[in-house]
Regions:
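Short, glycine/charged-enriched secondary-structure capping and boundary segments
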Residues: 22-24, 49-52, 119-123, 161-164, ...
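Short, glycine/acidic-enriched loop or turn micro-motifs at the edges of active sites
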Residues: 39, 153, 187-189
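Active-site acidic/histidine proton-transfer and metal-coordination neighborhood
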Residues: 54, 76-182, 192
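Conserved, mostly hydrophobic/aromatic
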Residues: 8, 27, 35, 52, ...
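Glycoside hydrolase catalytic-domain groove-lining segments
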Residues: 163, 174-180, 191-247
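Generic structural signal for well-ordered alpha-helices
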Residues: 24-25, 45-49, 90-94, 130-137, ...
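A generic structural signal for short coil/turn motifs at secondary-structure boundaries
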Residues: 15, 156-160, 219-223
């Protein structure tokens, strides 16, 4: 039974340091072997690759670009009318992943359009998402990369996000049916939406390609006060044979 491997999420850790190169150095100095970052696109990939190398780190996860955040976008995968922008963002993410030696890309689903009713647009958004995911799976397969789907809770963090439960994400993955598309399990979001962590971890772990953790409700470090028993959860992941990284 292999011990868990941890990656520093530089979108959340070392916020006092400006720029990713400085955060990479801090992560290396803190003893991490791996890092992840949501959006590395403000820096040139060659600069980040060199900084990671010098810090003795491997990059294990990035996200597709969020889209136009000033207009409220947070990913484009399921957003009707934004298919071309999603595919352009995917190309950019693949370019960064190749330069950084990063094997996984979180394919962000995006938000229900402002003013739209979630129930009314759900079917259309799922059709768009399925089309984009089939395209992404083909692009990623050519580069030996894995795409990830992450449910984000709609109770606290992002009420408009389209993909919000592991059950919804797993059903979409089954419909796409591509082996290089997997589930990204953020225990913070799963606890808020559904609880039942032991059951859900055991049920969905076979299709999980990456795990993220934060305490609930404050989204602090696992050691911070909150409702989650991380020693138990980490042991459960080990016992169930999880071999990926925990961010």
């Amino acid at each position: 039974m292999a011990p868990l491997r941890f990656s520093a999420n530089l979108s959340w850790l070392f916020p006092e340091l400006p720029g990713l190169p400085a955060r990479l150095r801090a992560a290396g100095s803190s003893g991490f072997e791996a890092v992840e970052v949501a959006w590395p696109y403000a820096e040139q990939p060659e600069v980040l690759a060199r900084a990671a190398r010098e810090a003795g780190l491997r990059l294990v996860l990035i996200n597709t670009p969020p889209g136009d955040q000033e207009k409220g976008e947070m990913g484009l995968g399921a957003v009707p009318g934004r298919q071309a922008a999603f595919r352009q963002g995917l190309e950019q993410a693949v370019r960064y992943a190749k330069a950084l030696g990063c094997p996984r890309i979180h394919l962000m689903a995006g938000r229900v359009p402002q003013g739209a009713d979630r129930i009314a647009v759900k079917a259309e958004m799922e059709i768009v998402f399925l089309e984009n995911l089939r395209h992404a799976a083909g692009v990623l397969a050519q580069e030996d990369l894995v795409g990830l789907l992450e449910p984000i809770n709609t109770r606290i963090t992002d009420p408009q996000y389209f993909l919000d439960t592991p059950q919804q994400a797993a059903a979409i993955l089954q419909k796409v049916g591509r082996p290089n598309l997997q589930l990204q399990m953020d225990i913070f979001h799963w606890q808020i939406m559904d609880g039942n962590l032991t059951g859900n971890i055991r049920e969905f772990l076979p299709i999980v390609g990456h795990v993220q953790v934060a305490q609930v409700p404050g989204r602090g470090e696992p050691s911070s006060p909150g409702e989650l028993n991380f020693p138990y959860l980490f042991q459960l992941l080990e016992d169930e044979g999880y071999k990926g990284f925990v961010g």
